[in-house]
């Protein structure tokens, strides 16, 4: 469960390493995000030398605001068959306004629930889908 002020690892090669959630998208009353939910994040640790650029053409730096989708959470997720899955860390992938990932690789496993939320591109880039 991701909420405001939660720090997350970035699971792609966009050059951003750590981010902090500043807003959970999906309505004014939505407080928590789970796997597959979109969030607004503030960059806390970035390597601008990688060349990722924001919508204005400037290189991404600390304090930049980006959109992201949650790909892993430490809070377990219940599946329809009754099983649960959880991960060792909270992680997200940086996306653009259309929902496409900005990175070209995804590191670590991602949850199968992303397929139901229409993030097939992230699923195809991930090395393992659990």
From Swiss-Prot:
CDD domains: Ribosomal_uL14 (cd00337). It holds the Pfam family Ribosomal_L14. SUPFAM superfamilies: Ribosomal protein L14 (SSF50193). Gene3D superfamilies: Ribosomal protein L14 (2.40.150.20). GO terms for cellular component: cytosolic large ribosomal subunit. Keywords: Ribonucleoprotein, Ribosomal protein, RNA-binding, rRNA-binding. One of its GO terms (biological process) is translation. It comes from the Bacteria. InterPro entries: Ribosomal_uL14 (IPR000218), Ribosomal_uL14_bac-type (IPR005745), Ribosomal_uL14_sf (IPR036853). The keyword Protease does not apply. Transmembrane segments: none annotated. Part of the 50S ribosomal subunit. Forms a cluster with proteins L3 and L19. In the 70S ribosome, L14 and L19 interact and together make contacts with the 16S rRNA in bridges B5 and B8. Binds to 23S rRNA. Forms part of two intersubunit bridges in the 70S ribosome. Belongs to the universal ribosomal protein uL14 family. This is Large ribosomal subunit protein uL14. It comes from Leptospira borgpetersenii serovar Hardjo-bovis (strain JB197). The gene is rplN.
């Amino acid at each position: 469960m991701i909420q405001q002020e939660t720090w997350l690892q970035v699971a792609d090669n966009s050059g951003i390493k750590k981010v902090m959630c500043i807003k959970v998208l999906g309505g004014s009353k939505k407080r928590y995000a789970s796997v597959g939910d979109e969030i607004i994040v503030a960059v806390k640790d970035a390597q601008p030398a990688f060349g990722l650029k924001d919508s204005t053409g400037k290189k991404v730096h600390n304090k930049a605001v980006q959109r992201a989708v949650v790909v892993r959470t430490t809070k377990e997720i219940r599946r329809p068959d009754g099983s649960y899955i959880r991960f060792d860390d909270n992680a997200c992938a940086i996306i653009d306004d259309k929902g496409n990932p900005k990175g070209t690789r995804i590191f670590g496993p991602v949850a199968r629930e992303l397929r139901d939320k229409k993030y097939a591109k992230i699923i195809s880039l991930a090395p393992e889908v659990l």
